[in-house]
Amino acid sequence: MFGVAKRFWIPMVIVIVVAVAAVTVSRLHSVFGSHQHAPDTGNLDPIIAFYPKHVLYEVFGPPGTVASINYLDADAQPHEVVNAAVPWSFTIVTTLTAVVANVVARGDGASLGCRITVNEVNRPGMSGDSSSWKGWGHVRWFIEEVPAGAA
């Protein structure tokens, strides 16, 4: 009998430890994991309506310039306007919390410029022209505005 115990004492200890661990985990699950909490729908904070963002894309250049213009809409889907007369503009109005604004134009004139205006404010760094690239204009901007009092 002691010969069998000497030979199999390590596997017996492992079996006993695994059994004790299984019982302990089972009891802990029954104590801590048994409560079902229903969400309390009566205490929800009101949803804050975001003020609309008015995003204005503009492409400008010498009169008579014709341009191919690519821009992103409010859902960041690309659109193309081919052979548009310059000056060109397009307005997006959205209540999304964030908008990726991007406008790229390529024209046949000596210079071409692009501008993105948000809520009638043209911020620094939001316009570009083709002074270094003949006939190109490009502006990209990520717009995330939280109105005063909404935070």
UniProtKB/Swiss-Prot annotation:
<comment type="similarity">
    <text>Belongs to the MmpS family.</text>
</comment>
<feature type="transmembrane region" description="Helical">
    <location>
        <begin position="81"/>
        <end position="101"/>
    </location>
</feature>
<keyword id="KW-0472">Membrane</keyword>
<keyword id="KW-1133">Transmembrane helix</keyword>
<dbReference type="Pfam" id="PF05423">
    <property type="entry name" value="Mycobact_memb"/>
</dbReference>
<dbReference type="GO" id="GO:0005886">
    <property type="term" value="C:plasma membrane"/>
</dbReference>
<keyword id="KW-0812">Transmembrane</keyword>
<dbReference type="InterPro" id="IPR008693">
    <property type="entry name" value="MmpS"/>
</dbReference>
<dbReference type="InterPro" id="IPR038468">
    <property type="entry name" value="MmpS_C"/>
</dbReference>
<protein>
    <recommendedName>
        <fullName>Probable transport accessory protein MmpS1</fullName>
    </recommendedName>
</protein>
<feature type="transmembrane region" description="Helical">
    <location>
        <begin position="8"/>
        <end position="28"/>
    </location>
</feature>
<keyword id="KW-1003">Cell membrane</keyword>
